[in-house]
């Protein structure tokens, strides 16, 4: 009998290499094992962290894999695979390693890494035990077993259950006699190192067991069900399609909450009892990923348009085109772990340059070099923090779309403009569209106007690089590798390399047929009919930009792409998304909050909105409330057709806006550390409450509150004229940010929220590093104010690097872990791990133990409890 008391008929253990027989049991252990077993260590750039050992067991504890050697940092890849390495268990860093209680590293291919500590804090759960099997290899006419999984014959069709990792399962099925060959556009992990697993057969049911999961397949029907290792049901397929359509259906209990599917304007984030047509359009980004409050996720890997449907008993997904069902199952049990599994599958999100976590000032559109200079001076002379000014479209007029010519009559010297911006510590981003215009008679003096169009139009293999159009505008085929290479080179030659732009605004990437009507779905692409891949158009466009930049890019600059549309996996191409062209009204604003939260629950880390709306002019009150919300999105950006620069509002309005802008910049050490956590662990910064309060049924329907990182509960005001709002406080003790007053969780309170302030609460046990008042993200943040919110244990890892290079990929960064022991009233500051060029040798930490008398609000604290002079060696501070 195994450890769960069920008789085994037969079983098999499969290891990374070959087959091995061993004693039969499955033990998930305590889940606190930091690294994976020996044989799976990973270090250096591009490493895949936490590979399982070749002996077939996944070990808990502090094995050799996953932690790093003294003096260096392990890092994730930027193009796929998992976050590498990770810290030792229990919250204290290994020498040279990343610290962080419960900050578990992302899953490695075929193994799982965990830093230990509390669950729900990111990364995949540790294996925490071994899987061992006894008996003979199960045999039968309906299935075959290999080291990657089990292939079934079901009727006249085929199905494969692939064990990608201990908590990641892929299911492929078709009504054809063999599974089609497929190269996924979304999935970047090759699953070269599958984990150990057992295969058992009894009473017509074949069970695959890993250290984390049991996958049960009814051999006669191919129905798949999932349980944890204790046989607690997670989800099960409810039927197989008899029609040959690409459809999967799953059971769903009435109390289940479902989240994800990308971002669409809505008043609710819970997808239960709803139907959604999954086809990208302006304002609607669809990611075929759902997450359940029960602790699992499902990702359908099919880029055609599709349909999702949820009822009281069933969840289904139907693809509009394709020749097989292909989906991934992710097990948590926490939602952070589910999302980390998705990122392990589709690729980690690289770090943006630090500047990209500051404020973007954008408008449709700045019409000249002098206008951009005026905006720059307005911010810098007004002492208003900002990091980027954006050049929207039409800078090419009267030249052709796609020419990338900046009209010399309006932009006399773009290079000098960018030099001036950089001197003022402001970055520039420029709009690029994936379309090219044919002009039979270009404007006089437009030398080279048609060069880009002509070069693409001449490409005809394997298909035309430009889609056929009955008019003058043509989208390029992003599925054509040669076209992607050429498109980036044109952008680099005429804009990035020539003038020094720092980021790319990839507009109209659905693509929406504008200004001429072009149906991309009906076109022939390099990968077949457009209808089979249409939703992945923006993914492949971002791939062109990212891969081109990494090969031939501006020296020393990390890639930054802002795109209007997206598809699963786009995060690995250093892309953020925004919610499209929206109206400047209250109803639209209200819907932005659940839209952004849904996007994060779809596995997508970076999202923003046109603060103040795109169409129309917002009132000062609406813009202020929208701006307050925007400061706590994962990207902070003003855009629209109206004039909305912060210095253009009334004296009172400007003061209110400056207050939240200043707070955002004071939080930059916190924000940038969370950005690293996003890259390194698959974390999500802008967090629906279900991330952290998964068992609290009250949070499932809350769509206007969210966590910003682990500490801050953000409660935007969404009612005109309101000076307070109702706030639900989840379990625990909470501090009102502005006053330091405490409240007990599990209750609803009325929070003060005049127009000058957004309602914010801080969870007890939080540690928030705050910098001085700064004007741009890379300005010096010494001294650091370390705010400690007593009442519970807690920790926070401060991450720092050069700010805008890829040296972090080779371990050039530092981490310092702060740990609060509430019972002992002691803040421990760990050794600094790692180093980077320009790292200060010493730091000043102004420690503040927050209460109602000090350490409150956005201003720099004048009452300091303890000044710590830090030289990189562990030290501490004690509360009185």
Whereabouts are the PLM-identified features?
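Conserved, mostly hydrophobic/aromatic
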Residues: 161, 212, 289, 379, ...
């Amino acid at each position: 009998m195994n450890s769960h008391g069920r008789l085994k008929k037969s079983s098999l253990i499969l290891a990374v290499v070959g087959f091995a027989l061993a004693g039969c049991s499955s033990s998930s252990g305590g889940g606190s094992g930091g690294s994976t077993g020996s044989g799976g260590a990973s270090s250096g750039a591009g490493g895949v962290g936490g590979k399982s050992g070749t002996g077939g067991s996944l070990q808990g504890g502090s094995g050799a894999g996953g932690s790093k050697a003294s003096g260096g940092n392990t890092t994730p890849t930027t193009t796929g695979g998992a976050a590498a390495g990770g810290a030792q268990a229990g919250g204290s860093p290994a020498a040279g390693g990343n610290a962080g209680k419960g900050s578990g590293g992302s899953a490695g291919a075929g193994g799982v890494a965990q830093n230990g500590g509390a669950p729900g804090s990111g990364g995949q759960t540790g294996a925490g035990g071994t899987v061992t099997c006894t008996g003979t290899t199960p045999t039968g006419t309906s299935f075959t077993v290999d080291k990657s999984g089990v292939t079934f014959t079901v009727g006249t069709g085929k199905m494969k259950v692939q064990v990608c990792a201990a908590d990641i399962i892929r299911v492929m099925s078709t009504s054809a006699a063999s599974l089609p060959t497929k190269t996924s556009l979304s999935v970047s992990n090759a699953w070269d190192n599958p984990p150990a697993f057992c295969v058992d057969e009894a009473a017509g049911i074949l069970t695959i067991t890993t250290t984390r999961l049991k996958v049960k397949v009814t051999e006669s029907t191919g129905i798949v069900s999932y349980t944890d290792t204790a046989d607690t049901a997670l989800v099960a397929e409810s039927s197989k399609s008899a029609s040959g359509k690409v459809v999967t259906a799953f059971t769903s209990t009435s109390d289940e909450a479902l989240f994800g599917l990308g971002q669409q304007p809505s008043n609710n984030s819970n997808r239960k009892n709803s139907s959604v047509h999954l086809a990208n359009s302006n304002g609607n980004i669809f990611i075929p990923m759902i997450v359940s409050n029960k602790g699992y996720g499902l990702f359908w890997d099919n880029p055609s348009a599709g349909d999702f449907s949820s009822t009281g008993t069933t969840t289904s997904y139907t693809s509009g085109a394709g020749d097989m069902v292909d989906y991934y199952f992710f097990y948590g049990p926490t939602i952070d772990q589910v999302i980390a599994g998705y990122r392990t599958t589709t690729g980690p999100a690289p770090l943006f340059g630090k500047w990209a976590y500051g404020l973007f000032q954008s408008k449709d559109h700045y019409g000249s070099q002098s206008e951009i200079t005026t905006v720059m001076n307005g911010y810098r002379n007004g002492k208003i923090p900002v990091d980027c000014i954006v050049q929207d479209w039409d800078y090419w007029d009267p030249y052709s779309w796609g020419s990338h010519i900046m009209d010399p009559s309006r932009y006399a010297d773009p290079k000098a403009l960018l030099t001036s911006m950089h001197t003022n510590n402001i970055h520039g981003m420029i709009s690029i569209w994936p379309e090219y215009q044919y002009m039979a008679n270009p404007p006089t003096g437009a030398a080279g106007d048609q060069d880009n169009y002509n070069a693409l139009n001449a490409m005809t293999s394997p298909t035309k690089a430009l889609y056929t159009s009955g008019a003058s505008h043509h989208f390029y085929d992003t599925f054509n590798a040669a076209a992607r290479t050429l498109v980036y080179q044109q952008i680099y030659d005429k804009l990035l390399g020539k003038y020094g732009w720092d980021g790319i605004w990839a507009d109209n990437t659905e693509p929406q047929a504008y200004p001429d009507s072009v149906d991309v779905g009906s076109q022939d692409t390099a990968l077949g009919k457009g209808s089979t891949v249409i939703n992945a158009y923006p993914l492949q466009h971002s791939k062109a930009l990212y891969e081109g930049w990494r090969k031939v890019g501006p020296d020393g600059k990390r890639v930054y792409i802002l795109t209007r549309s997206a598809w699963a996996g786009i995060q690995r191409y250093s892309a953020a998304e925004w919610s499209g062209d929206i109206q400047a009204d209250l109803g639209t604003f209200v819907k932005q909050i659940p839209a952004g939260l849904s996007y994060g629950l779809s596995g997508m880390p970076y999202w923003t909105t046109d603060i103040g709306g795109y169409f129309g002019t917002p009132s000062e009150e609406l813009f202020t409330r929208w701006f307050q919300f925007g400061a706590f999105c994962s990207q902070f950006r003003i855009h629209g057709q109206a004039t909305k620069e912060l210095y253009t509002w009334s004296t009172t309005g400007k003061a209110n806006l400056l207050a939240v802008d200043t707070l955002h910049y004071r939080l930059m050490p916190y924000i940038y550390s969370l950005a690293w956590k996003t890259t390194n662990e698959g974390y999500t910064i802008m967090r629906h409450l279900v991330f952290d309060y998964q068992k609290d049924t009250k949070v499932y329907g809350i769509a206007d509150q969210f966590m910003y990182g682990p500490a801050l509960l953000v409660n935007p005001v969404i009612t005109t004229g309101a000076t307070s709002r109702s706030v639900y406080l989840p379990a625990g003790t909470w501090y009102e940010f502005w006053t330091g007053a405490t409240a007990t969780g599990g209750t609803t309170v009325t929070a003060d929220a005049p127009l000058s302030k957004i309602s914010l609460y801080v969870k007890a046990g939080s540690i928030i590093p705050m910098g001085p008042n700064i004007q741009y993200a890379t300005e010096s943040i010494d001294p650091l104010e370390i705010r400690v919110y007593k009442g519970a244990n807690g920790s926070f890892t401060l991450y720092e690097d050069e700010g805008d290079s890829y040296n972090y990929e080779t371990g050039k960064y530092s981490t310092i872990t702060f740990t609060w022991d509430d019972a002992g009233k002691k803040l421990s500051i760990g050794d600094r791990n790692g180093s980077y060029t320009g790292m200060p040798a010493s730091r000043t930490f102004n420690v503040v133990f927050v209460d109602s008398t000090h350490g409150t609000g956005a201003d720099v604290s004048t009452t300091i409890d303890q000044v710590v002079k830090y030289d990189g060696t562990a030290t501490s501070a004690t509360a009185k």
